[in-house]
Amino acid sequence: MIVPVRCFTCGKVIGNKWDTYLELLQADYAEGDALDALGLVRYCCRRMLMTHVDLIEKLLNYNTMEKSDPN
């Protein structure tokens, strides 16, 4: 959903690298090369960006305050 601000394992700040990571992928960098360019060398930090799924835009389409009609 929302990009984690810190790595769950080591605590390094990674939230500010998400947009740059996406830009590098759009520029035809390989995932590993993009992470190297960002300075992410630990496996735990690399995992945080590689496995993140950005679902926030899809979830904003649902209205949680809307009541469904039981009939």
UniProtKB/Swiss-Prot annotation:
One of the record's GO cellular component terms: RNA polymerase II, core complex
Domain of life: Eukaryota
Subcellular location: Nucleus
Keyword check for Nucleus: yes
Signal peptide positions on this chain: none
Molecular functions (GO terms): DNA binding; DNA-directed RNA polymerase activity; zinc ion binding
Major localisation: nucleus
Family, per entry: Belongs to the archaeal Rpo10/eukaryotic RPB10 RNA polymerase subunit family.
Quaternary state and interactors: Interacts with IYO.
Name recorded for this polypeptide: DNA-directed RNA polymerase subunit 10-like protein
